[in-house]
Each structure stands twice: as C-alpha cells, then as structure tokens.
C-alpha cells in the first residue's frame, strides 16, 4: 500500500498580536494551524475578526507580539526576505498604479522581484492570458473595471512564481457576476499552477465554494477548523427556522430528534435529524408560527452554532473597534 504524505507548507504556532491603543486589544489570540501544499485554505469571519491581521503577519508586514510561523520552510521573524520571495499577495484594496498599463504594472513587479527580462516577458504573457487580460494589457489601469483590476492583480501576484498566494477579500465590493468570474479564475489557477492559496473572506458562499478547509475566526480566535462539508455535516441534521411570537421551547427541548435550539432576533433555529419527517410534529408542539423554513445547513449555521450569533449580524461594514466595544458590553 502506497501512502500519500501531504507536506505542510505553512505552519503557524501560537500566533498572537496585541495592539496598544488606549487599551490593549488582542487582534490575533494564540492561533495555531497548518496548511498543506496545494491546499486552498480559508480564514472566514466578520470584519474585525483578525483575518487580515493574521495574513499581514504571515506576509511579514506586521510583527506578531508572540508566537511564530514558517512559510515554505522559512521563519517569518528570522527569514522575512525569503518568506516574501515565496509568496504572492493580492491586497483587499487595489494597489496597481492607475497611470501605468496592465503590462507595465506587471513588468515593474517583475523588476522588483528580480525576474530576468526573458523570463519576465514570457511570464507576463502567461499570467495575463490565464486571467483573460492579454488583449487589454496596453490599456491604463484607470480604464479597467473593478473586476479587470482584480484580475490584473491576481496575475501580478503570480508573476514571480510564488509557492503560496495570499488573497485578502478577493471579491470585496464586486457585483455578483464579477465575483463569479473571479472565482472561476481562482479555480483555474489552482488547477493550472498548483499553487497553495490562503483566502480571507467574510462571504460564506465564497469560502464554501473555493476552500478545501476553513478556519472560522472570531475576535482573534479560531473557533473551529475543518472542511466546509464536515463543518455543516457535524451540525447533525437539517435546519428548521421559525419566526414565532411565543415559542414553547420547553416542549421542543424534550424532542429526541432535535439536536440544538437557538433563539435570535425573534426567530428560532432548530437543528433536526430527518427534519422533513418531523416538521409537522414540531409545528404542533411549538405553537403558532408566522413563517417556517426547512433547509440544509450553511456555514452561517456553523458560525451561529459556535459563536451564539448569526454571521450577518456583524455585516461587511462592522469595524474592529466597534466589534471590540460590542464584545466588552456583552461580557
């Protein structure tokens, strides 16, 4: 029997980052994980959860307060220059020069990374073709749409042939159709380039579609880490969501097939084994309902299960300091 041994290309151990403002804020709280070579690994959580800070530490842009990590075998504290040569980064905010063409932006990037001229020209053509931007290579970046900019930045991140690609909120602010296109390009580069990818996102569907494994991160801590399929399956059944004024939850708790009950914002969510079979009995027990929904579990249900609140409560706009203030108020 031949065993396939997966090699870890990212090793994170007890990583912590504390920011000192008027009070100390723990942005990343003693997290540890490994990422296998060729894996698409997601850091999923609301804005302010610690995702981008974690990515910034791994990219050697921010120093940790304690703990360490190895990227492609290189220590982020002792060998930062070797780490930087091993990674490509697509930032959350566009960082291309608007006055340069797409081609010129990539050429500048190649020069900075010391890619030889002959190799550089071949790679620029290859990566721009990969993201379907070769025909627009001579246009100034300021003439590109948001999706085109993102595609050029994907190409730029790949130009120096990194072992690991960091994507920080790769589809933030893009319309649904453009998001779909970007997902297709990410899947394409995984297939063709065999590159390891770390994605930060607050989009459930993005993490579900692209990631082999997901670490759900909240208030700087990893609350759970597994494949999207396992995370949803481990909830133990389907989800019945009820909007109800006066729920009779005590009787519902006695039903053996109800695995979990969560009440939030005037709604009750039940995790139920074989939900369709038991729905009518639940409705009789729980009382008069305004609406009912029965569906398979989502990553939002996983987040609710582990944190006690829905993911969309935080929204895309919730800032780090506002979330910390809310957290303290609830303690």
Predicted feature residues:
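Helical segment within the ABC ATPase nucleotide-binding domain
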Residues: 180-193
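Conserved catalytic motifs of ABC-family nucleotide-binding domains
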Residues: 161
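Short, charged/small-residue-rich alpha-helical element at the C-terminal edge
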Residues: 238-310
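Walker A (P-loop) phosphate-binding loop of ABC-type ATPase nucleotide-binding domains
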Residues: 46-50
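Conserved ABC ATPase "signature" region
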Residues: 107, 111, 118-136
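Catalytic Walker B motif of ABC-type/P-loop ATPase nucleotide-binding domains
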Residues: 165-168
């Amino acid at each position: 029997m031949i065993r396939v041994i997966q090699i870890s290309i990212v090793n994170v151990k007890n990583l912590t980052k504390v920011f000192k403002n008027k009070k100390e804020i723990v942005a990343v709280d003693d997290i540890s994980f490994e990422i296998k070579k060729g894996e698409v690994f997601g850091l999923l959580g609301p804005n302010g959860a610690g995702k981008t800070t974690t990515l910034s530490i791994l990219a050697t842009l921010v120093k940790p307060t304690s703990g360490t990590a190895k990227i492609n075998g290189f220590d982020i504290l002792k060998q930062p220059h070797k780490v930087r040569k091993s990674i490509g980064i697509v930032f959350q905010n566009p960082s291309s020069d608007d006055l340069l063409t797409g081609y010129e932006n990539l050429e500048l990037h190649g020069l900075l990374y010391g890619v030889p001229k002959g190799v550089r020209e071949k790679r620029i053509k290859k990566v721009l073709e990969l993201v379907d931007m070769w025909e627009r290579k001579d246009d100034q970046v300021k003439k590109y749409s948001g999706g085109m900019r993102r595609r050029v930045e994907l190409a730029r991140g790949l130009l120096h042939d990194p072992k690991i690609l960091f994507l920080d909120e790769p589809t933030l602010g893009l319309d649904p159709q453009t998001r779909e296109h970007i997902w297709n390009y990410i899947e394409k580069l995984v297939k063709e380039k065999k590159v390891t990818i770390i994605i930060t996102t607050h989009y459930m569907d993005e993490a579900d579609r692209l990631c082999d494994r997901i670490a759900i991160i909240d208030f700087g801590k990893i609350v759970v880490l597994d494949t999207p399929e396992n995370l949803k399956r481990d909830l133990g059944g389907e989800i019945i969501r009820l909007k109800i004024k006066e729920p009779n939850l005590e009787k519902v708790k006695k039903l053996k097939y109800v695995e979990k009950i969560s009440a939030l914002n005037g709604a009750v969510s039940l995790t139920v084994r074989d939900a369709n079979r038991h729905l009518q009995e639940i409705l009789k027990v729980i009382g008069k309902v305004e609406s009912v929904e029965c569906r398979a579990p989502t990553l939002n249900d996983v987040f609710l299960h582990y944190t006690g609140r829905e993911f969309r409560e935080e929204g895309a706009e919730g800032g780090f300091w506002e979330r910390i203030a809310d957290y303290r108020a609830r303690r």
